[in-house]
UniProtKB/Swiss-Prot annotation:
Protein name: tRNA dimethylallyltransferase
UniProt xrefs under Pfam families: IPPT
Assembly: Monomer.
Binding site for ATP: G20, P21, T22, A23, S24, G25, K26, S27
Binding-site list for substrate: T22, A23, S24, G25, K26, S27
Essential cofactor(s): Mg(2+)
EC annotation from Swiss-Prot or TrEMBL: 2.5.1.75
Species assigned in the record: Hydrogenovibrio crunogenus (strain DSM 25203 / XCL-2) (Thiomicrospira crunogena)
Site features described as Interaction with substrate tRNA, chain residue numbers: T111, R133
Entries under PANTHER family matching the protein: TRNA DIMETHYLALLYLTRANSFERASE (PTHR11088:SF60)
Family: Belongs to the IPP transferase family.
GO molecular function terms noted in the UniProt entry: ATP binding; tRNA dimethylallyltransferase activity
Gene3D superfamilies named among the record's database cross-references: 1.10.20.140, P-loop containing nucleotide triphosphate hydrolases
């Protein structure tokens, strides 16, 4: 293990990113790194931002949050929305503050859209208009293909990459067009909000070669969540005023299926099966995204132990400071 000079990392404005699919051991690695480095953790997870959603999101425990400073956890109620642009803005401020305290920012999580926004930037788009959104959503519920055809007329590039069964992105693209008179694709080209350009991301990805082991781990973890009271937690969240199935919090994996269970659209066994399948599908999308990433240290969480992974990360960071 090479010696680590944290001051050099701070001077060179290097942030550490711990990326990986769900249930790959990101939190365990990050907490283990805290024994070797003065770190503060910035959550890169679109579900951990919500208060009261703890068990179903595998949120760090209170003890873990006390032991190591965590950010962007429990910042909103489930009835509120939070965009990738909001995330980029918050991370900019947090990274500056963490460096000023003499600590290393560690961005850890699996929301790849957030990581992409940090690296590529985000177009400055108008805030959501609930009336327009509701109108388009109603049309989509009646005929998804017709709404997709409408998008194809005004923004063929967006229609090419957005499936008709992806209501969130489909509705947003049409909403932006109605509000601005310009295609979403054009707006994204015209004005990019800066990503994390003033800082460098040292990227570490936990990618298991053995997909079967990851699938087993996902199933084990979900059953642990159930034993820890996930359904009771979900029922409490769903009792909040102003909650609907269209909100981002309720679209989170596990909560979406629990919502349908409480709506009596799923029986218990179907709820469990659908939740595990949806989590595995999420992991597949995360791995697909990670395999396209460049300049990253790849570690297999099932072929190494956590001490080996910590050593590999420390050596990687040390080499970066020497090569800069």
């Amino acid at each position: 293990m090479q010696s680590m000079n944290v001051a050099q990392l701070i001077e060179q404005k290097i942030c550490l990113a711990i990326m990986g699919p769900t249930a790959s051991g990101k939190s365990g690695l990050t907490m283990a790194l805290a024994k070797h480095l003065p770190i503060e953790i910035i959550s890169v997870d679109s579900a951990l931002i919500y208060r009261g959603m703890d068990i179903g999101t595998a949120k760090p425990t209170l003890d873990e949050q006390v032991a190591v400073p965590h950010h962007l956890i429990d910042i909103l109620d489930p009835t509120e929305s939070y965009s990738a642009a909001d995330f980029v803005e918050d991370v900019h401020e947090l990274v500056k503050e963490i460096f000023a305290r003499g600590n290393l920012p560690v961005l850890a999580g699996g929301t790849m859209m957030y990581f992409n926004a940090l690296q590529q930037g985000m177009a400055k788009l108008p805030s959501a208009d609930e009336a327009i959104r509701a109108k388009i959503h109603q049309a989509w519920q009646a005929n998804p293909a017709a709404v997709h055809a409408q998008l194809k007329q005004v923004d063929p590039e967006a229609a090419e990459r957005i499936h008709q069964n992806d209501p969130q992105r489909l509705i947003r693209a049409l909403e932006v067009y109605e509000m601005t008179g310009k295609p979403l694709t054009q707006l994204q080209r015209e004005g990019q909000q800066e990503g994390l350009t003033e800082f460098k991301l040292a990227k570490v990805a936990l990618i298991p070669e053995d997909r079967k082991k990851l699938h087993e781990q996902i199933a084990v973890r979900f059953h642990e969540m159930l034993n820890n009271g996930f359904l009771k937690e979900a029922e409490k969240v769903f009792s909040l005023d102003g909650l609907s199935a269209d909100l981002p919090a309720i679209r989170s994996v596990g909560y979406r299926q629990a919502w349908l269970f409480f709506a009596q659209e799923y029986d218990y066994d179907t709820f469990v099966e659908k939740s595990i399948v949806a989590t595995r599908q999420l992991a597949k999308r995360q791995i697909t995204w990670l395999r396209k990433e460049q300049d990253l240290l790849v570690l297999d969480p099932f072929k190494t132990n956590v001490d080996d992974r910590v050593e590999a990360v420390l050596d990687y960071l040390s080499a970066l400071t020497k090569n800069a």
